[in-house]
Amino acid sequence: MERTLSIIKPDAVAKGVVGKILDRFESNGLKIAATRKMQLSRADAEAFYAVHSERPFFGDLVDFMISGPVVVSVLEGEGALIKNRNLMGATNPKEAEAGTIRADFAENIDANAVHGSDSLENAAVEIAFFFSEREIS
């Protein structure tokens, strides 16, 4: 069964829309195989987003991701990765289709409510960053 990682970012957690976002996943055929609410440390955020370390937005991204708690989930199902990408919508909420998570809950390209794995290879790495195999059911 295909798996992908979702992070509900601090802006969406602060707005109290975690339940609505998790419901979107389940309503669209994705099983929540593991989930936890946590506060990322600076080291966690820097390690998780290390692929972006040379990009000009890296510092702001890390600061944002440690600004409040996040909800990290493993989503499972047929076509889980692309299904989650479609549910999230475009990275920039102004470009996201109506009815997507980002169109409905995100403020801007920085505070854009959710993160989702962009490939199956990255999904495996990202899932292992947050969860051991025994924590996923």
Swiss-Prot record:
Keywords tagged on the record: ATP-binding, Cytoplasm, Kinase, Magnesium, Metal-binding, Nucleotide metabolism, Nucleotide-binding, Phosphoprotein, Transferase
Gene Ontology biological process: CTP biosynthetic process; GTP biosynthetic process; UTP biosynthetic process
Required co-factors: Mg(2+)
Catalytic activity: a 2'-deoxyribonucleoside 5'-diphosphate + ATP = a 2'-deoxyribonucleoside 5'-triphosphate + ADP; a ribonucleoside 5'-diphosphate + ATP = a ribonucleoside 5'-triphosphate + ADP
Family: Belongs to the NDK family.
Predominant subcellular localization, coarse grouping: cytoplasm
Highest rank taxon of the organism: Bacteria
Role according to the record: Major role in the synthesis of nucleoside triphosphates other than ATP. The ATP gamma phosphate is transferred to the NDP beta phosphate via a ping-pong mechanism, using a phosphorylated active-site intermediate.
EC code: 2.7.4.6
Localization, UniProt: Cytoplasm
GO terms assigned for molecular function: ATP binding; metal ion binding; nucleoside diphosphate kinase activity
InterPro entries: NDK-like_dom, NDK-like_dom_sf, Nucleoside_diP_kinase, Nucleoside_diP_kinase_AS
SMART domains: NDK
Positions of the catalytic residues: 115 (pros-phosphohistidine intermediate)
Enzyme class: transferase
Protein name stated in the entry: Nucleoside diphosphate kinase
Gene3D superfamilies: Nucleoside diphosphate kinase-like domain
Binding residues annotated for ATP, in chain numbering: 9, 57, 85, 91, 102, 112
Lineage summary: Bacteria, Pseudomonadati, Campylobacterota, Epsilonproteobacteria, Campylobacterales
One GO cellular component term noted in the UniProt record for this chain: cytoplasm
Record text on subunit structure and interactions: Homotetramer.
